[in-house]
């Protein structure tokens, strides 16, 4: 009973270990693709974000370098009334190595709302007498500037969204007729046709000759008719003679046991028995707990 209990316990432990192992393997097979897909999605998103950030940083640095390399000719209007000469004017110095003009102006904005009329200003003081002009009335035409070389191409921008699906194409031209194929197999027979029209009536036959009547042979017997109704019951018969005696019946059940009889007379004396064995003295061995005899046997 103890061995069977141990076998059942070991069997339960083995089945439990196999079941947990199967569940663990199935869980790994299910969760590993999901984790890999999620990590791949995060990696792709981070790569797109880093690419976009790098592109934005490059655009900002290009704008900063472009602003640094712009000429100072746009400050002419601010220094028009100063005594100092206009700085950075490539047209005055006569050199056109770095006089790249700015790009064309952008499109005109929408006109603003008309402002409110201002108050009339106070009359100004009489001005000082003017000085004679020191420069000729006609401005000196500056030499034309050399066209600047085309800059290097900028970094590729981020991929744009997919375009709209195009319009469906026009249907193609009809194909040419193929060559006639080989004749097909013989078809199944068609349905039966409609019955034909009745034929024309035939000519009248030859009249029969009159002969004396001859009686024919008797026909075969007909089938048996249905069974008739049952007749009325007859008169009761006379009593028969007595039969032979029947066989002997089975034995009856056993009766109650009788009372014990008187004791019998004592029997004669039996034959004398065989002589007994020689007596021995047993010795006890304390090594294995056995009892040995002088004749060397162990009983």
From Swiss-Prot:
A GO-annotated cellular component: extracellular region
GO biological process: collagen and cuticulin-based cuticle development
SMART domains with a match to the protein in the record: Col_cuticle_N (SM01088)
An annotated Gene Ontology molecular function: structural constituent of cuticle
Swiss-Prot/TrEMBL keywords: Collagen, Cuticle, Disulfide bond, Repeat
Composition-biased stretches (Low complexity): 164-181, 251-263
Biased composition (Pro residues): 129-162, 182-195, 215-233, 265-274
Disordered as annotated region, ranges: 105-282
Segments forming a coiled coil: none
Location of region: Triple-helical region: 216-278
The family this protein is said to belong to: Belongs to the cuticular collagen family.
Quaternary structure note: Collagen polypeptide chains are complexed within the cuticle by disulfide bonds and other types of covalent cross-links.
Functional description taken from the UniProt entry: Nematode cuticles are composed largely of collagen-like proteins. The cuticle functions both as an exoskeleton and as a barrier to protect the worm from its environment.
Protein name: Cuticle collagen 34
Organism field: Caenorhabditis elegans
Name of the gene: col-34
